[in-house]
């Protein structure tokens, strides 16, 4: 939805093209509440296929996000700490853990 995010994504993927001895091994796209779910439905919709258990770090994540006081909103906004924690809980239940971060694999080179 955000044009600057799309441009940054395209620049990152372009700059990360596989080349001998300098290949970026993994490119993961992450979910941004109040942006990802409003993307152009004619384009690829965020469909996570890579999850990381963040149960040990959820409170640290929330504490770190508080620094971004211009981005974090009050509940029930999608970018409230409550909503962020709730989404992490839902993503965690998808993989059988308390909290998880969900990603879409753009590319993995092994």
Regions found by a protein language model. Name each.
Residues 1-110:
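Metal-dependent de-N-acetylase/amidase catalytic core
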